Design a protein with these regions (language model features):
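Extended soluble regions of mature proteins
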Residues: 21-218
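Bacterial Sec-dependent N-terminal signal peptides
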Residues: 1-23
Length: 218
């Protein structure tokens, strides 16, 4: 009896692994919904309806977050662990280089995030997704819906959810003290030109991560 249970579990796990499609190249488009429930317009309200388009090619990813305020692009090389931020707001353009330690510091709130899984499912962008609850060291929680049908080779572009056994197609985040939700509108496996991950050679003011932190504190 014990052997049959072990065998059944092995078959189930094997079926899950082999049914997953590894995303080595493609594009995922997420829409952002923010509801401050406040009659007075807030900064977060301006982000409602923003989009985050993620381009993946092997170890490389490029996330373009576009709102009425401007565009912020995050380019990650998962081999070197180096990250570049391109910020275009109000006519100003900045290119910020982050070393691996800088990227870890930026996302330190998600260190040691743990997930619990619930038997709650829904379809997002054509994929069956399971509900998970992420819990941070601070005690803060957030809801994620992920699919085990897809698994990116590079999951650094979604730092908070990178330990999930699949791709998050809907997830909560915090903007200020308000909850916001990213939901995937589409997933495609179209080829992505390698030039998409080239860094601009002009037009941007290049600053370090430390300089960007000082600018934010001023």
């Amino acid at each position: 009896m014990k052997k049959s249970i072990v065998l059944s579990c092995f078959i189930f796990l094997a079926a899950t692994v082999f049914s997953q499609k590894r995303i080595t190249e493609g594009v995922i488009v997420y829409n952002l919904v923010v509801n401050t429930n406040d009659s007075t317009p807030k900064l977060a309200d301006g982000l409602d309806g923003a989009t985050n388009t993620v381009y993946i090619k092997g170890r490389l990813s490029r996330s373009e977050f576009v709102s009425i305020y401007g565009t912020q692009t995050t380019i990650i090389d998962n081999k070197t662990k180096n990250v570049t931020l391109l910020k275009e707001y109000g006519g100003k353009k900045y290119m910020i280089t982050l070393l691996p330690a800088d990227w870890t510091e930026t996302n330190k709130k998600y260190d040691s995030v743990s997930f619990s899984f619930e038997n709650d499912y829904k379809t997002i962008a054509g994929y069956n997704c399971r509900k998970a609850i992420g819990k941070l060291k601070s005690g803060e929680t957030f809801i994620v819906y992920y699919t085990t049908d897809l698994l990116p080779d590079n999951q650094e572009f979604q730092y908070s959810n990178k330990t999930l056994p699949g791709l998050a197609l809907e997830y909560e985040t915090t903007i200020g003290n308000k909850k916001a939700v990213f939901t995937a509108a589409s997933v495609s496996f179209n080829p992505v030109p390698i030039a998409k991950f080239d860094l601009p050679k002009s037009g941007f003011r290049v600053i370090t991560y430390e300089e960007s932190k000082k600018a934010r504190s001023n």
